[in-house]
UniProtKB/Swiss-Prot annotation:
Biased composition (Basic and acidic residues): 130-143
Gene encoding the protein: hspG9
Polar residues composition-biased segments: 89-100
Region described as Disordered: spans on this chain: 85-143
Name this protein carries in UniProt: Small heat shock protein hspG9
SUPFAM superfamilies from the UniProt entry: HSP20-like chaperones (SSF49764)
Induction: Down-regulated by Pseudomonas aeruginosa, PAO1 strain and PA14 strain infection.
Keyword annotations from UniProtKB, A to Z: Stress response
Family (UniProt): Belongs to the small heat shock protein (HSP20) family.
Amino acid sequence: MATIFDILNTLNNNNFKNCKRQCPINKSNKTIIDIIPSMDVTMTNDKLIIETELAGISKDDIEIDIKDSILTIQGEKKKNLNKQQQQLVSEKSSTSPSTLDSKEDEPSIEEFEDDIKPKSATSTTTTTTKENKDDENKTKSSDKKFISERSFGNFKRYLDLTKVLYQLDLNSINTQFENGLLTITINKKLHYSNTIKININ
């Protein structure tokens, strides 16, 4: 006879297969899964403990829910930008003009005539612009990656609790997230049974 540890071990090892076979898929909104986190599941005399490695992820980017006896842990591991990258992103967002503003800011015929410059001034401006672009390209190309092994993107992990759900008190769920380790603790019911006796009227 299989023990509770055998059941949980089977569920944990076959997690990806269970996900494909049992979990409902929303075809209209498919999400590409980039990371499948590692998980440890332990059953003690009075509780179920689920530990999931989520290093480098903020707790605000983690979602946990139980639906149709399936525990789902999902979210996104975002890539942190350095100061130079953040500055470039903010500059692009602040300098990109909108279509409406560009039409309103177009100069009139009189303004065109007043702003006509001699060819020498125009060529000087063009040269300066090219120099600025060259400086920007040099700055961008100064960052060189020698090793890139870290993974970023969406993560999701399923755990099918169907065979042990009758033992668990779902109102006692407790979660902790510390040092990249998510710990979910679910207490077992004081009195439980997988058999329901039905009286005949």
